[in-house]
Curated annotation (Swiss-Prot):
Function in brief: Involved in the catabolism of short chain fatty acids (SCFA) via the tricarboxylic acid (TCA)(acetyl degradation route) and via the 2-methylcitrate cycle I (propionate degradation route). Catalyzes the Claisen condensation of propionyl-CoA and oxaloacetate (OAA) to yield 2-methylcitrate (2-MC) and CoA. Also catalyzes the condensation of oxaloacetate with acetyl-CoA but with a lower specificity.
Organism: Antarctic bacterium DS2-3R
Keywords: Transferase, Tricarboxylic acid cycle
Temperature dependence: Optimum temperature is 31 degrees Celsius. Cold-active. Is rapidly inactivated at 45 degrees Celsius, and shows significant activity at 10 degrees Celsius and below.
Sequence intervals crossing the membrane: none
Protein name: 2-methylcitrate synthase
Biological processes per GO annotation: carbohydrate metabolic process; propionate metabolic process, methylcitrate cycle; tricarboxylic acid cycle
Gene from which the chain derives: gltA
Amino acid sequence: MTEPTIHKGLAGVTADVTAISKVNSDTNSLLYRGYPVQELAAKCSFEQVAYLLWNSELPNDSELKAFVNFERSHRKLDENVKGAIDLLSTACHPMDVARTAVSVLGANHARAQDSSPEANLEKAMSLLATFPSVVAYDQRRRRGEELIEPREDLDYSANFLWMTFGEEAAPEVVEAFNVSMILYAEHSFNASTFTARVITSTLADLHSAVTGAIGALKGPLHGGANEAVMHTFEEIGIRKDESLDEAATRSKAWMVDALAQKKKVMGFGHRVYKNGDSRVPTMKSALDAMIKHYDRPEMLGLYNGLEAAMEEAKQIKPNLDYPAGPTYNLMGFDTEMFTPLFIAARITGWTAHIMEQVADNALIRPLSEYNGPEQRQVP
């Protein structure tokens, strides 16, 4: 009898087809519906990219206006959801709050069990609109601050920052945040997206699939890496009065020592990209803009030193989480909120995959090879 080939972690397995995004490891490129992600980040708003992922094409002016009006009118946090968040301890991880909030949003949605294309699109749009209120309120309550209501006169990114910090962000900060949302929006069959598709394949509802995806994203091998990057910076020590070169020298020495001790350093390497994450140059430009805006050269020094030491020792390049972590830190987000920010962006990709799965569904049920004891009698 021929032994089956086992693909641990489903490595190298093509599970299905998708028209949503294409990750090309050979050319280190990422396309959303055929468009290079770096071009979308340079020319589009996050709202336009969300529309693209869900509807296959970029919106025209009237389509964008209708979409923006819907998003802005569905931002407010329902009292039931706020109440559920308030029941959770501020000692729990924000990912637990995010998972719970999405579950409550699903339970309260009038079309919760309706998986028609129209209902799923409406639920996806509503979730995109409301989730920033969850993240912003959770950060504020952990600081002992009150909820800030959304503003319909601000776009998605500007409003997100307003609800979190209580002041209008500078245009360059809004743009950097917008870029990060676009870059995190979608990335093919990653662990959380595949989780969402598996759940959807059982004919479970959209919010159940997103809740499961959040559970997958909580793991440090998937979504927690941007938090881990900041923990590395904090372990090295962030000294605001330090020069770029001084910070680089310290961080490079830290990395050399960490690699000698065979420590796992997050923010480097990627399961798909072997020659560098295609999203990094665009996100690094956003980080550079934030370093200039806030006059924080020591952050660039820490970044450069770690990157150089890893390249020299292992020839491993950064992934998206590496520049994203310090970017969010400079904006003022608490480190533990970084992965919920990932959710805010990836809701678009997850729900696009959920709708694609529903449209051509087959229950995802792989086989396993048993390696336990042979059949035996109970004594």
